[in-house]
Amino acid sequence: MRGRSLTLSRVKLELARRSMSATSVPSMADFLTKKPYSPPSWASHLRPLPSHTFSLAHLPTPIHRWNLPGLPNGTELWIKRDDFTGMELSGNKVRKLEFLMAEAVDQHADTVITIGGIQSNHCRATATASNYLNLNSHLILRTSKLLADEDPGLVGNLLVERLVGANVHLISKEEYSSIGSEALTNALKEKLEKEGKKPYVIPVGGSNSLGTWGYIEAAREIEEQLNYRPDDLKFDDIVVACGSGGTIAGISLGSWLGALKAKVHAFSVCDDPDYFYDFVQGLLDGLHAGVNSRDIVNIHNAKGKGYAMNTSEELEFVKKVASSTGVILDPVYSGKAAYGLINEITKDPKCWEGRKILFIHTGGLLGLYDKVDQMASLMGNWSRMDVSESVPRKDGVGKMF
């Protein structure tokens, strides 16, 4: 009986291992299909409810232990790999796009407009998703004043965007600040409408009330993954980067309404926490959620030198994490969030001791290519291989040619 019990335990553990990477895995036939949407029961009171969603991401994404150095005794850190949602579509943005692109198609759009920074992961994902669905894409990309009149090049996300045929419109950071993202996208929309196009506008990061459903769904996905486990794993905290607000609004609301009940910590990489509390509140009000943003998420300032700007300590941390755990963080979002988390833990280790933390990796790997010059000094692990005369050659010892 003891042997049978051990066998059953092994089977349960194997099923749990598999379930953390797969719940009800969609078939390949579902990819790029539009389907009627049914919300989780605990979110069915929200309004308006999406009518459809597109299957664009490779879901569910796996969850596994992540042994970052410096964790307090008894603290467990796990990571949800939303950097595995696809290749060209990798990262958190595709979850929002599943809902936004469905609405674009429902409105018979033939063109999609969105806006972001010069290395925007969201813009890259939007360009790819648009191409998949036979829609044209127009990207308004913010860059420095000195570079706004030059070819933006082919580094990182720009390479993918231009490969898939996106129309890139450059603006300076000063123009972006003085005009605003909404006015800029509306101006381009009016121009394209005069040309006979039917454009659909997606805001920065896909962060509006409809896009918020992407991470409400992610909360349901995490619930289902935990339900498959035999060990009653429950997360005390969820940690995620915050760049435009939609992801933290969705995961915080989903955790609050659903069974997770985890404390959500968002690490902002651009604007300050007060801005994001107000912005998230607007998204929640747009869903008639009836909750206060400050009750469902703790927002920490992790922007450091500024958006997409890094200190040497942050880049060294990204390198150290990759070397010690094999997980590659992007320096703009997840890298700053993980760095911020470790700093918070270091400040008050007792507060985190014994807790089970889930870190959501939001992707952005392509952004590393924009940091090559800054990262180069950290990469010393190479040498010229010694192939002296004593090393045998194919046609005889000591012969070089």
Curated annotation (Swiss-Prot):
Domain of life: Eukaryota
Enzyme Commission identifier(s): 3.5.99.7, 4.4.1.15
Subcellular location(s) of the protein: Mitochondrion
GO molecular function, one term: cobalt ion binding
Tissue distribution of the protein: Highly expressed in stems and cauline leaves, and at lower levels in roots, rosette leaves and flowers.
Catalytic reaction annotation: D-cysteine + H2O = hydrogen sulfide + pyruvate + NH4(+) + H(+); 1-aminocyclopropane-1-carboxylate + H2O = 2-oxobutanoate + NH4(+)
Residue stretch of the organelle transit peptide: 1-37
Coiled coil: none
Gene Ontology annotations for the cellular component aspect, listed alphabetically: chloroplast; cytosol; mitochondrion; nucleus
Single GO BP term: stress response to cadmium ion
Pfam families: PALP (PF00291)
This protein's record includes keyword Nucleus: no
Keywords, comma-separated and alphabetical: Acetylation, Hydrolase, Lyase, Mitochondrion, Pyridoxal phosphate, Stress response, Transit peptide
Residues recorded as bearing N6-(pyridoxal phosphate)lysine in the entry: K93
Chief subcellular location: mitochondrion
Induction statement: By drought.
pH-dependence of activity, as noted: Optimum pH is 8.0.
Requisite cofactors: pyridoxal 5'-phosphate
Catalytic residues, chain numbering: S120 (nucleophile)
Record function comment: Catalyzes the production of hydrogen sulfide (H2S) from cysteine. Is mainly responsible for the degradation of cysteine to generate H2S, a regulator of stomatal movement and closure. Has high affinity for D-cysteine. Possesses 1-aminocyclopropane-1-carboxylic acid (ACC) deaminase activity. Acts as a regulator of ACC levels and causes changes in ethylene levels.
Family: Belongs to the ACC deaminase/D-cysteine desulfhydrase family.
Protein name: Bifunctional D-cysteine desulfhydrase/1-aminocyclopropane-1-carboxylate deaminase, mitochondrial
Source organism of the structure: Arabidopsis thaliana
Gene this protein is translated from: DCD
